[in-house]
Amino acid sequence: MTTAASSLILGAGPTFAAEPIKTAGIYTVPVEQQWVSRIHIAALAAQDRGDIEYTFSENVSNTDYARVIREYAEAGNKLIIGEVFGAEAEAREVAAEYPDVAFLMGSSFKEDAALPNFAVFDNYIQDGSYLSGIIAGAMTKSGNIGMVGGFPIPEVNRLMHAFMAGALEMNPDIKFQVSFIGSWFDPPKAKETAFAMIENGADILYAERFGVSDAAKEKDILAIGNVIDTQAEYPNTVVASAIWHFEPTLNKAIAQLQAGKFKAADYGVYSFMKAGGTSLAPLGSFDGKVPSAAMKLVKKREADIKSGSFTVIINDEEPGSS
């Protein structure tokens, strides 16, 4: 029979059978980790709709990543999603061996027309990060903000820069302490790093990694979340969070596959606020506690971002302390 398998990639024509696309996720960290959790949640939602049939592997080492890709491709998966920041070259080499399999991978690099089945994405949620920075700039009393990140790679750097820019628009005298822990998932190390920043005068923390909000809670200061909303776990600590919605990214890829139009592309734009890829989490327990001037500016900038009259600068360079 004519299967969805042979007609998903560009040039093969549309598929008419609405069969779920056999999809595999490959993650180097647990699916509970905040960044990967957004991909996982979107994939589960797509499976619930009947668009995909989803399986996944977590805690896959970078050295093992290519082998797992090959296993899923050999098993008949036609869409493979994940993050290849630590296995960029190896992942592309394997993808080239399976031209009838579509790859949608988190990557620090752009798409390559020579590898038409390999699309890339990243969490370009700088818009939400900017808005959360405005709130942080209004809430700090010491004018000293601590920022703990995983690695200084573009997808982290741009969010930190956007947060800093938002804070500085609200309060141009703010100083920042910036540090990277060299891990995507090491809550104890993130917590230890945050404690040092608090000792050095920070009274609000940018929690790019798990563990930072724990330090803020223990020392009774505030934190700003990233990618997911953890206020339910830290109701008196996390003021606001820039949320990443992976659904627009994945749904676009699924639609392209269903139409037989999937090709190498940069899906990062579907993380922009105007595409529905990011938002500021509800203030919840901090509703009414953020200065009105800050909230007025947040609403103005949000409207400006959505209309295109204000653009948050994307700066992928490593940020430093001030």
What are the roles of these predicted feature ranges?
Residues D112-I135, M147-P152, P235-P248:
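Short beta-strand elements at the ligand-binding edges of bilobed clamshell
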Residues A96-D122, V227-N236:
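Flexible loop/hinge segments that line or gate small-molecule binding clefts
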Residues I21-R49, T55-Y65, F85, P152-R158:
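Extracytoplasmic "Venus flytrap"
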Residues A43, S129-D173, V178, D266-G288:
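An alpha-beta-alpha
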Residues R49-N59, N171-W184:
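Short beta-strand elements in bilobed, periplasmic/extracellular small-molecule ligand-binding domains
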Residues M1-T2:
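N-terminal export leaders
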Residues A259-S322:
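Hinge/cleft segment of the Venus flytrap/periplasmic-binding protein
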Residues N77-V84, L104-G106, N200-F210, N226:
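Periplasmic-binding protein-like
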